[in-house]
């Protein structure tokens, strides 16, 4: 064929001849420029992911020869190359210093680097040795978003969630908390009833010999409950139907007995609210089989009025509250952008009419109906309103309520009631039949009332405490590890009181794991942007320690989370939520 076609040359079948000429050319130019001759490995160094034409020094290493017909652009920016670049830095053979020295393509304000342009194999071989290919460096790591304090604080934020279990661990023994004497137990109960504030020393050398410490420990375990049935678990109430199966409940099928129990419960509930209103009770919980309500006195959680937080809720419950005239807000639900824009425009025009918190006034309903009419007015203008089937009012209502239904039984469904509306909520809960289960293991059982102070019809109960000593393995052998377990309905004041005692008894060093009742974690949602005006001066007779009142008066900081871990080291706290 070469004889028939003089211009035809089969040189493409011999790439070694081309490379030999290229190397000869490189040597000649290198001798002129005073640089080292070309080495086959330079191509792969300048173009990552490009295999050499000949094995060269890599011969015998099992490296496959590069396809000479491969597209260089696909080779440089191939998916395989991109995956190789995304490998963590620790897996790259390139030193960390060299990678850090190169300009990062993720730095703000710097132009994005352009990949080198190669039009042929010669351009790759004879390209500018100073040209650096596109190297993807690691993007700067974002700061950690964990809810953790900057190393150490003299106190920790208030946690309004109910706890079911606390586990304290320390290198110091907890034996002082075991086997309280009868006199110490009685003294602790009296101190609780009289709201005696105990001031312990900074550090106690012999905790087991400190009668004052042991009495204060008994005082911190006391709480009040209604109703009280020793054979029935009254907390938690959500999700415990399986544990209550088979329990004797004579009221479940006796309506007259149910009426007596509910009437006594209503009196106890009203008594608690009156104490709260008089600031003789700081807060209390109402635990039903579907939701939990936290009532707080004015001056707590950064609010200067009485507040009530309810979670979780459903659309049906919220609608029933609206029908009763209860004004409430949903702090974790973002306002509709269109409504927010209308409100901002109204405010800019000088409309200072206060907006009701429930967002469902009569004017809103009228505007919604007018919007529906306007949305179908264009059909009448075209004269086809009779030919096109319009959605009925029920479909429109369901479409609008679709977003509300999505919130049911979720933390975002939390409801906040303020001021005098809390009294309306009280009457609503007393008269609402749905707060008592009609069937199942909890049928006929009224909601559980939990309070840090005594009230009408309440029963005094104490949390259960148990200390355990274990051996933990360390490098040199075994080390004694001491733990203290607290179980029961643990309220915020008990958590703070116990940490104050352990701070002195354990010489400023311990760690704790908290187990929260999940539906109540959302009670830590901030409800007021500013600190309360009425603080501890008006709550000095509420039955809590002054430092506990000071902590509970602070604005909520945990959001919809709760404390999971608390550590005290050298009398300074760190925590995680």
From Swiss-Prot:
One of its GO terms (biological process) is replication fork processing. Its main location: nucleus. Residues 1-67, 328-382 are annotated as: Disordered. It is found in: Nucleus. Residues 362-375 have a biased composition (Acidic residues). The keyword Signal does not apply. Keywords: Cell cycle, Cell division, Developmental protein, Nucleus. One of its GO terms (cellular component) is replication fork. It comes from the Eukaryota. The keyword Nucleus applies. Component of the replisome complex. Replisome component that maintains genome stability by protecting stalled or damaged replication forks. After the induction of replication stress, required for the stabilization of stalled replication forks, the efficient activation of the intra-S-phase and G/2M cell-cycle checkpoints and the maintenance of genome stability. This is Protein downstream neighbor of son homolog. It comes from Xenopus tropicalis (Western clawed frog). The lineage of its organism: Eukaryota, Metazoa, Chordata, Craniata, Vertebrata. The gene is donson.
